């Protein structure tokens, strides 16, 4: 099952973990076949939030909500179950300084013909 491990850190701790330590963690997970993707994010000040309300788009600088910890990166992993995903998350280096939110992903289940109709109507 796929799990998204969201890395949260306070701004003052964004550089508490050396890039090489995170890369070593990712390489180990990749070699084990458990890592599907991983990326660090730029600071929250570079975020842009997009909203569609009543058919109108608004774009604002910054994140959706103010928070002490900010989303600093993610690891998309393939684990047997939540327990294994938690064990993997505990080994992600920034866990020592912030938090790792572990969330299962879900598959989108739709009829392919319905997707084609929707895509045709949108273009």
Regions found by a protein language model. Give the residues of each.
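Conserved, structured core segments of small domains
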Residues: 1-123
């Amino acid at each position: 099952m796929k799990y998204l491990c969201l890395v949260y850190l306070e701004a003052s701790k964004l550089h508490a973990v050396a890039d090489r330590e995170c890369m070593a963690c990712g390489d180990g997970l990749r070699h084990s076949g458990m890592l599907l993707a991983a990326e660090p994010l730029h600071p929250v000040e570079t975020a842009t939030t997009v909203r569609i309300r009543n058919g109108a788009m608004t774009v604002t600088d910054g994140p959706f909500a103010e928070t002490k910890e900010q989303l600093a990166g993610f690891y998309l992993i393939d684990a047997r179950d939540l327990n294994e995903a938690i064990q993997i998350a505990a080994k992600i280096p920034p866990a020592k300084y912030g938090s790792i939110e572990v969330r299962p992903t879900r598959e989108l289940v739709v009829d392919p013909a319905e997707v084609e109709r929707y895509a045709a109507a949108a273009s």
